Amino acid sequence: MDLKVKWWLEKDGGLVLGKGRCMLLEAIDRGGSLREAARICGISYRAAWGKLRASEERLGKPLVETQPGKRGMEITPTARQLIKIFHSIDEKLQKTTASIVEKSLKEE
């Protein structure tokens, strides 16, 4: 038996980063393209762009940037830090939930 936990980071009551946005940023980092990242994540380009902009507005910091005269997109140091924090928290939560299930099953 498994216990599943869905969580995300919010600021001022609005979503900043969850699993989907983390995956989107990682796909941008790997491929350098929002269009390709959106395809990989199974969402439209417009939806991907909207999610990024909403997160950036809530944070007050850019998560992606483009270089003048160049095609493509790169994630910012802020985005890299958020991805790292997300994975760190997620790993700890997964271990904790597994431990809770294990202890609960032993008690019965």
Model-identified regions with their sequence ranges:
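Basic, amphipathic "hinge/linker" alpha-helix immediately C-terminal to the N-terminal HTH DNA-binding motif
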Residues: 66-89
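Short helix-boundary/capping micro-motifs
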Residues: 28-38
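Residues within the DNA-recognition helix of helix-turn-helix
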Residues: 51
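Residue cluster at the C-terminal edge of the helix-turn-helix DNA-binding motif
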Residues: 57-62
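Alpha-helical linker/hinge and terminal dimerization helices associated
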Residues: 82-104
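Short, Lys/Arg-enriched N-terminal segment that forms or immediately precedes the first helix
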Residues: 1-13
